[in-house]
């Protein structure tokens, strides 16, 4: 039989063990939470006192767990809201995200400062993005990059360039909508939209190429996209491993196309079928030196990626938002019917002038881009120690322009979670408050083409088709980009 003294001794021993366990946990927890601060902040010396508010998170992981947790809920904006609640509305915070020490900017003023100042803030990307899109090309000097950017921008910009593409985009949209409706079954709408957009950008990049080749490339891009923001861990089972394999297959395909195009370039020029690839093959610097194949392939990979993801996702979301708001759907449809009524009876197909008359559809597209904020963040890197609103941004730290933080800020847009095209009535957004395509010297060169594709797709869809969703209440997944978790399984039905 146990005596009271034995029971008391055992009880005290258990308390001692528990106290040691809790104490060890607290000390270890506190130590681990301070490692990043000691490693990244303390080494800055006196500059550390003028860093923005915030915390550096866990070793290696930083604040990625908080980021992922927020973006796996139904309200990803809690990530920024939590920073504002804890540290005040400074518009700039220190953190450790995407595997690097970071400064997050999320107000129009701070975003504008970073995007417009190319002297202090240059291009910056996670290591995984550099590996997958091409370190050699992403690491070019500013002057060389400007020269190449001009080459790759010219095919996308200006009325003359866009007018050339209207008819081609129309043909693709009309044919594929008719094909989808003819299937008379549910399909993965987002996947089909990505294929549509890839056909368009493929035509612009290559001038002409086989549908089979474009379909193969589009499949590789699916894996490539999933690895862009993931940790650069090249081990089977990780997204980066699959993405790197996809890049190698893409490089091989593009090298074959490049070799073939070099042989045929003279003939193609005579036919007038010139794509971006031909401009890159012909490009020379001031010393007459041509681009190496590696550079050309990297530029093709970057432009093919940028040229189809935005338009595919935005077109899908525009349709979904309109179906959630029947009165907006009807108003948008009536505008398209009016455009048809006003055109001469001899005219076939859309013109760029008609597209410019789509005022309500323009507001729908702008609101779709704001509400979805497809790609966050925009990556920059501090080229030198810089000051923003009195806070220090250390040289070498990545600067994350949090587009969603601006687009979903109730002080910038009233009721930001509401889809409301009327907010664009007679509204000119102030600099830094509407940045779906970035801003400054590195603004997305394909922004005009992206919107052109969306206009043309919505025009024909609204007039002739409807969407029957398999899962109307499907939850939204926000990583890597916002989309219905089933990728919008739906049936495209031709209107009678």
UniProtKB/Swiss-Prot annotation:
Molecular-function annotations in GO: ent-kaurenoic acid monooxygenase activity; heme binding; iron ion binding
Record bears the keyword Transcription: no
Primary location group: membrane
Keywords assigned: Heme, Iron, Membrane, Metal-binding, Monooxygenase, Oxidoreductase, Transmembrane, Transmembrane helix
InterPro entries reported in the protein's UniProt record: Cyt_P450 (IPR001128), Cyt_P450_E_grp-I (IPR002401), Cyt_P450_sf (IPR036396)
Topology relative to the membrane: Single-pass membrane protein
Enzyme Commission number(s): 1.14.14.-
Gene Ontology CC terms, in alphabetical order: endoplasmic reticulum; membrane
Swiss-Prot/TrEMBL catalytic activity: melianol + reduced [NADPH--hemoprotein reductase] + O2 = 7,8-epoxymelianol + oxidized [NADPH--hemoprotein reductase] + H2O + H(+)
Superkingdom, natural source: Eukaryota
A GO BP entry: sterol metabolic process
UniProt record similarity statement: Belongs to the cytochrome P450 family.
Name of the protein in its database record: 7,8-epoxymelianol synthase CYP88A154
Originating species: Ailanthus altissima (Tree-of-heaven)
């Amino acid at each position: 039989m146990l005596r009271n003294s034995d029971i008391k001794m055992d009880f005290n021993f258990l308390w001692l063990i528990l106290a040691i366990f809790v104490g060890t946990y607290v000390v270890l927890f506190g130590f681990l939470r301070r490692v990043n601060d000691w490693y990244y902040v303390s080494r800055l010396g006196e500059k550390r006192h003028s860093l923005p508010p915030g915390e550096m998170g866990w070793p290696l992981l930083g604040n990625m767990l908080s980021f992922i947790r927020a973006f796996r809920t139904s309200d990803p904006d809690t990530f920024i809201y939590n920073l504002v609640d804890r540290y005040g509305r400074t518009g700039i915070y220190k953190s450790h995200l995407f595997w690097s020490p970071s400064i997050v900017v999320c107000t129009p003023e701070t975003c504008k400062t970073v995007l417009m100042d190319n002297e202090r803030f240059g291009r910056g990307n996670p290591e995984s993005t550099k590996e997958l899109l091409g370190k050699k090309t992403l690491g070019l000097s500013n002057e060389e990059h400007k020269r190449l950017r001009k080459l790759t921008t010219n095919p996308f910009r200006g009325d003359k360039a866009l007018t050339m593409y209207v008819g081609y985009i129309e043909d693709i949209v009309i044919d594929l909508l008719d094909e989808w409706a003819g299937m008379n079954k549910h399909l993965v709408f987002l996947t089909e939209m990505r294929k549509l957009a890839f056909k368009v950008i493929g035509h612009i990049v290559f001038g002409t190429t086989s549908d089979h080749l474009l379909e193969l490339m589009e499949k590789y891009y699916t894996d490539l996209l999933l690895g862009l923001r993931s940790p650069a861990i090249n081990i089977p089972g990780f997204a980066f491993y699959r993405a790197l394999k996809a890049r190698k297959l893409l490089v091989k395909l593009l090298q074959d196309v490049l070799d073939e195009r070099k042989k045929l370039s003279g003939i193609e020029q005579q036919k007038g079928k010139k794509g971006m690839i031909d401009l890159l093959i012909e490009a020379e610097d001031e010393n007459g030196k041509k681009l190496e194949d590696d550079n050309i392939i990297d530029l093709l990979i970057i432009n093919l990626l940028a040229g189809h993801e935005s338009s595919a996702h935005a077109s899908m979301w525009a349709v979904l938002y309109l179906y959630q708001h029947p009165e907006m759907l009807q108003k948008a449809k009536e505008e398209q019917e009016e455009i048809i009524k006003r055109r001469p009876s001899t005219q076939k197909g859309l013109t760029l002038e008609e597209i410019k008359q789509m005022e309500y559809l323009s507001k729908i597209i702008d609101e779709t881009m704001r509400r979805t904020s497809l790609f966050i963040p925009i990556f920059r890197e501090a080229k030198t120690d810089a000051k923003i609103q009195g806070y220090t941004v250390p040289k070498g730290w990545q600067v994350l322009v949090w587009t969603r933080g601006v687009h979903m800020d109730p002080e910038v847009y009233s009721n930001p979670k509401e889809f409301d095209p009327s907010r664009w009535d007679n509204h000119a957004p102030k600099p830094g408050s509407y940045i779906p395509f970035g801003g400054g010297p590195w603004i997305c060169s394909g922004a005009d083409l992206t919107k052109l594709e969306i206009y043309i797709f919505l025009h024909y869809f609204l007039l002739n088709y409807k969407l029957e969703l398999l899962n109307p209440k499907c939850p939204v997944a926000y990583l890597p980009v916002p989309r219905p978790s089933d990728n919008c399984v739906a049936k495209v039905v031709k209107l009678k």
